[in-house]
């Protein structure tokens, strides 16, 4: 396609359909076409090259209008295709003229190369591209992880995950990014620009995609469905993360210990265990946290804020996840099943913790004493032993605790509350853990098995005590005579000899 040197118009790279052709497209094709047109146009306005465009002062206004009539026509078409009915501001409409660009830009229809010497553009057929998506064909394979992609540009972006390349750097703060779109989105943090506003609640967003995803909160729309279990999601990334549960894929590996994770955020959080880094500090009490969500949950303790209420019983919670977990108590739903023993759980985290019984995995290690734990919460609880901190005090008796959950459990002693009832015998309990242990009496379940002799136990604590027979470990020592015992109860009984009771 030959054009004037250094000048490319939006019409040169946009794919257009006649009215007759448009009628033959189904809704999915029209939606894809709309998204493609938006991306193409967004790439053009993001080039920010209008300052290099020089209008010929000898040209009449009429001549200029004739030259750019096609661009305006296509822009109007995009506006009509937009879900909002009008997506372009006046400023954006003025940015459809482009000049020179040093680096190539890749999009849905091919690769656009703009240089000062020549302009080339290779178009791919829109409908053949759509057909490839429909058929699930993936032509470009990553040699590192064998993942395949429909477009070469997507493969190029993916390869930067393996190489660590981040060629797009923010001029304000120097933060690098793998994709130019990520840099553009990040730059709006510095400018404070949030041009996309939700008409339902007034919340504003930096990018259109965030607004589209947010609006699904109001509409309840969940267009992305898992083919394995039928669970639906608002955002495609949520579906992609969820599918790793079924595939077992854990692409994010810790270079320190080799542990792998399904999500990049989980790897980032895990790596702070090695560095002991706690970036997020509470301004109220100075307590620091490994990750932002932990800080936000903690801050609600100071404010007393519990915005999430259960419609069934009225109980309120600080975070939405707690409400979701609580609601499964009313529904009785237990969608997570252990493949080893068939036991089902309300929460995926409960299943993961349970599976460590079978694998004997204890992935969380204390950097102070090197003791290992099967869950992160156990590690956090243990670490407060070393610092001696007990920030949670009971207003009734003044007893202090390391964890808020310990204080909550303790307070039920004063109130006499026993909210957890066994459905078999109606016996009530103060703690859920007590109810869980009690249930095994009715079921006869003994999930904790000794590897040395095969004997099974109802509780993990029983297994731990039993294993000391094989190891010879006697951790409880008498201060009077230095005699050691396997169990604390044996030590207590022995000490009565010295006291004369």
Curated annotation (Swiss-Prot):
Zn-finger segments (C2H2-type): 140-162, 168-190, 196-218, 224-246, 252-274, 280-302, 308-330, 336-358, 364-386, 392-414, 420-442, 448-470, 476-498
GO biological process: blastocyst hatching; regulation of DNA-templated transcription
Name used for this protein in its record: Zinc finger protein 14
Gene transcribed to yield this protein: Zfp14
SUPFAM superfamilies: beta-beta-alpha zinc fingers, KRAB domain (Kruppel-associated box)
Positions of the KRAB domain: 8-80
Residue intervals passing through the bilayer: none
Highest taxon of source: Eukaryota
Main localization, broad class: nucleus
Family the entry assigns: Belongs to the krueppel C2H2-type zinc-finger protein family.
Keywords carried by this UniProt record: DNA-binding, Metal-binding, Nucleus, Repeat, Zinc, Zinc-finger
Keyword check for Zinc-finger: yes
Leader peptide range in chain numbering: none
One Pfam family named in its UniProt record: zf-C2H2
Record carries keyword Repeat: yes
CC per GO annotation: nucleus
Single GO molecular function: zinc ion binding
InterPro entries in alphabetical order: KRAB (IPR001909), KRAB_dom_sf (IPR036051), Znf_C2H2-type (IPR050758), Znf_C2H2_sf (IPR036236), Znf_C2H2_type (IPR013087)
Subcellular location: Nucleus
Function: May be involved in transcriptional regulation.
């Amino acid at each position: 396609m030959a054009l004037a040197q250094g000048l490319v118009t939006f019409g040169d790279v946009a794919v257009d359909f006649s009215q007759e052709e448009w009628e033959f497209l189904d809704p999915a094709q029209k939606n894809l076409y709309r998204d493609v047109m938006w991306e193409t146009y967004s790439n053009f306005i993001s080039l920010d090259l209008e300052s290099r465009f020089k209008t010929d002062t000898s040209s009449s206004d009429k001549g200029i209008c004739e030259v750019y009539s096609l661009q305006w026509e296509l822009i109007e078409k995009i506006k009509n295709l937009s879900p909002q009915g009008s997506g372009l501001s006046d400023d954006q409409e003025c940015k459809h003229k482009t000049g020179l660009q040093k680096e190539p830009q890749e999009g849905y229809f091919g690769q656009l190369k703009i240089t000062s010497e020549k302009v080339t553009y290779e178009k791919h057929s829109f409908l053949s591209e759509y057909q490839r998506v429909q058929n699930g064909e993936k032509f470009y394979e990553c040699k590192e992880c064998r993942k395949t992609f429909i477009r070469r540009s997507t493969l190029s972006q993916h390869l930067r995950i393996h190489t660590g390349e981040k060629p797009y750097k923010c001029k304000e703060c120097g933060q690098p990014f793998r994709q130019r779109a990520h840099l553009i989105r990040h730059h709006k943090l510095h400018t404070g620009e949030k041009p996309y506003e939700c008409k339902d609640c007034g919340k504003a967003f930096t990018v259109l995609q965030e607004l589209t995803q947010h609006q699904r909160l109001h509409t309840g729309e969940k267009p992305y469905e898992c083919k394995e279990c039928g669970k639906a999601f608002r955002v495609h990334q949520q579906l992609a993360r969820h599918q790793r549960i079924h595939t077992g894929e854990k692409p994010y590996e810790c270079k320190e210990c080799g542990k792998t994770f399904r999500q990049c955020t989980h790897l980032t959080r895990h790596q702070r265990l090695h560095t002991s880094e706690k970036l997020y500090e509470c301004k109220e009490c100075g307590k620091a946290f490994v990750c932002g969500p932990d800080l936000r949950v903690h801050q609600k303790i100071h404010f007393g804020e519990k915005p999430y209420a259960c419609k069934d019983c009225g109980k309120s919670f600080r975070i939405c996840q707690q409400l979701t977990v609580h609601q499964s108590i009313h529904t009785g739903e237990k969608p997570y099943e252990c493949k080893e023993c068939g036991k089902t759980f309300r929460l995926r985290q409960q299943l993961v913790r349970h599976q460590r019984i079978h694998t004997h995995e204890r992935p969380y290690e204390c950097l102070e004493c090197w003791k290992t734990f099967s869950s992160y919460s156990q590690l956090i609880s243990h670490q407060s032993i070393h610092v001696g901190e007990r920030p949670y005090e009971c207003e009734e008796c003044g007893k202090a605790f390391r964890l808020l959950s310990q204080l909550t459990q303790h307070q039920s002693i004063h109130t006499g509350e026993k909210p957890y009832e066994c459905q078999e015998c109606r016996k009530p309990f103060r703690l859920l853990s007590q109810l869980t242990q009690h249930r095994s009496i009715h079921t006869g379940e003994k999930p904790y098995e000794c590897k040395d002799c095969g004997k099974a136990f109802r509780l993990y604590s029983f297994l731990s005590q039993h294993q000391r027979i094989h190891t010879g470990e006697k951790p409880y020592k008498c201060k009077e005579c230095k005699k050691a015992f396997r169990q604390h109860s044996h030590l207590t009984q022995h000490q009565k000899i010295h006291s004369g009771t």
